[in-house]
């Protein structure tokens, strides 16, 4: 077994993602029924990036999300603490930096926008991570957090949780190089704050004008904020 626990020890989490790196992108596309592409595009559009903007994409993994952001004409750098994930994305021509979300290797006020997609949930202290994101963002800059969340329709929520806890791990066994990691995925999603609670946590970390948009019925929530 190579999976992290909900204690989210950084070394365990990084090791787990190193183990899934080889088939990470295809596994996510299969498990999300192709919706991952829509979620990445929605994140890019919500940031309203301009050519020349400097963007930090945290927990970028194989840099597939970073490549999407570059379609805006912005200059984007991918950061992740899993070296294996960054290596798996070597063919994507964007700058890549190994770094921990709670100790980013960048100076204050370096970026016009910071984004983290499906990674905040894996940070050992995600509120501290949000503060660190604020530190490296210029005054007036933007934050986008795209993360699994709580479906808004109760019957759909019940079906989704059934899929998450039972079906998803079974499908992962067929397509993933480390299916146990997807047991952690399901458990961490179930334990994650809902949309409103996360919005309050983002605000407590120093961000303002926090709002969110539900995607795919609330399976994913896209939180946007400014500094």
From Swiss-Prot:
SUPFAM superfamilies: S-adenosyl-L-methionine-dependent methyltransferases. This is Demethylmenaquinone methyltransferase. The lineage of its organism: Bacteria, Bacillati, Actinomycetota, Actinomycetes, Mycobacteriales. The keyword Metal-binding does not apply. CDD domains: AdoMet_MTases (cd02440). InterPro entries: SAM-dependent_MTases_sf (IPR029063), UbiE/COQ5_MeTrFase (IPR004033), UbiE/COQ5_MeTrFase_CS (IPR023576). Belongs to the class I-like SAM-binding methyltransferase superfamily. MenG/UbiE family. S-adenosyl-L-methionine binds at residues 62, 80, 100-101, 117. Keywords: Menaquinone biosynthesis, Methyltransferase, S-adenosyl-L-methionine, Transferase. Methyltransferase required for the conversion of demethylmenaquinol (DMKH2) to menaquinol (MKH2). One of its GO terms (molecular function) is demethylmenaquinone methyltransferase activity. It comes from Mycobacteroides abscessus (strain ATCC 19977 / DSM 44196 / CCUG 20993 / CIP 104536 / JCM 13569 / NCTC 13031 / TMC 1543 / L948) (Mycobacterium abscessus). HAMAP family: MenG_UbiE_methyltr. Its EC number is 2.1.1.163. GO terms for biological process: menaquinone biosynthetic process; methylation. Pathway: Quinol/quinone metabolism; menaquinone biosynthesis; menaquinol from 1,4-dihydroxy-2-naphthoate: step 2/2. It catalyses: a 2-demethylmenaquinol + S-adenosyl-L-methionine = a menaquinol + S-adenosyl-L-homocysteine + H(+).
């Amino acid at each position: 077994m190579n999976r992290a626990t909900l204690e989210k020890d950084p070394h365990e989490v990084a090791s787990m993602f190193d183990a899934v790196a080889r088939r990470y992108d295809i596994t996510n596309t299969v498990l999300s029924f192709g919706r991952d592409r829509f979620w990445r595009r929605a994140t890019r559009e919500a940031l309203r990036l301009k050519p020349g903007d400097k963007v930090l994409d945290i927990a970028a993994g194989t840099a597939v999300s970073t490549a999407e952001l570059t379609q805006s004409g912005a200059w984007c750098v991918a950061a992740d603490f899993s070296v294996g994930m960054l290596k798996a994305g070597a063919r994507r021509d964007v700058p890549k930096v190994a770094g921990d979300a709670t100790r980013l290797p960048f100076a204050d006020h370096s970026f016009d926008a910071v984004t983290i997609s499906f990674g905040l949930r894996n940070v050992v202290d995600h509120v501290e991570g949000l503060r660190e994101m604020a530190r490296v963002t210029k005054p007036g800059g933007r934050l986008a957090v795209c993360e699994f969340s709580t479906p808004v329709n109760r019957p759909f929520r019940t079906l989704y949780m059934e899929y998450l806890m039972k079906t998803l791990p079974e499908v992962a066994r067929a397509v993933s190089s480390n299916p146990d990691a997807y047991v952690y995925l399901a458990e961490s999603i179930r334990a994650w704050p809902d949309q409103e609670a996360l919005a309050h946590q983002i605000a407590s970390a120093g961000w303002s004008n926090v709002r969110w948009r539900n995607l795919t019925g609330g399976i994913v929530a896209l939180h946007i904020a400014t500094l």
